[in-house]
Swiss-Prot record:
Organism: Schizosaccharomyces pombe (strain 972 / ATCC 24843) (Fission yeast)
Keyword Transmembrane: yes
Entry's transmembrane regions: 5-22
UniProt-recorded name of the protein: Mitochondrial import receptor subunit tom20
Entry membrane topology: Single-pass membrane protein
Topological domains annotated Mitochondrial intermembrane: 1-4
Gene of this entry: tom20
Keyword annotations from UniProtKB, A to Z: Membrane, Mitochondrion, Mitochondrion outer membrane, Protein transport, Transmembrane, Transmembrane helix, Transport
GO cellular component: mitochondrial outer membrane translocase complex; mitochondrion
Ranges facing Cytoplasmic side: 23-152
């Protein structure tokens, strides 16, 4: 017990000593302050760049999912639409359970089902309660992207 108390107190003293040294250098050494600012800016820029890439990747995923939905043929009769709806919802759930990382295909299935459902607002409310959050975020983005008219 005595040895562990001595080692613990030495480590605590070293940590406090380093904190005091760091604070002294930060306050009194202009070169050290510049170095800290450069590091902070570098980390901040890297974080911004990473966020831009993530946003761009998400937008590409939304576009690809909308292309999958657009290429899916939509049935015309009510019975076929009902069957199509049930198949797409089941397939979306199955895809997410089998491959949780691959949300694009699952979201495309859920969105295809949403497009043929007679009351899409109610179905979207049901999706918000039952569908996992990553897929729901993709569905929201798909709906927003599709509702905005494109200028061509």
């Amino acid at each position: 017990m005595r040895r562990s108390v001595i080692i613990g107190s030495l480590l605590a003293t070293a940590a406090v000593g380093y904190a005091i040294y760091f604070d002294y250098k930060r306050r009194n050494d202009p070169h050290f302050r510049k170095t800290l600012k450069r590091r902070y800016k570098k980390v901040h820029e890297a974080k911004k760049q990473e966020e831009k890439l993530a946003t761009k990747k998400f937008d590409i995923t939304v576009e690809e999912a909308l292309q999958v939905v657009a290429s899916t043929p939509v049935p015309s009769s009510a019975e076929e639409k009902e069957l199509f709806f049930m198949q797409q919802v089941a397939r979306g759930e199955q895809l997410f359970q089998q491959q949780p990382d691959n949300i694009k295909e699952s979201a495309a299935c859920f969105y295809s089902a949403l497009k043929v459902y007679p009351q899409p607002v109610e179905l979207f409310a049901i999706y918000e309660r039952t569908v996992p959050e990553p897929i729901m975020n993709l569905l929201r983005a798909m709906q927003a992207k599709e509702s905005i008219p494109s200028v061509e």
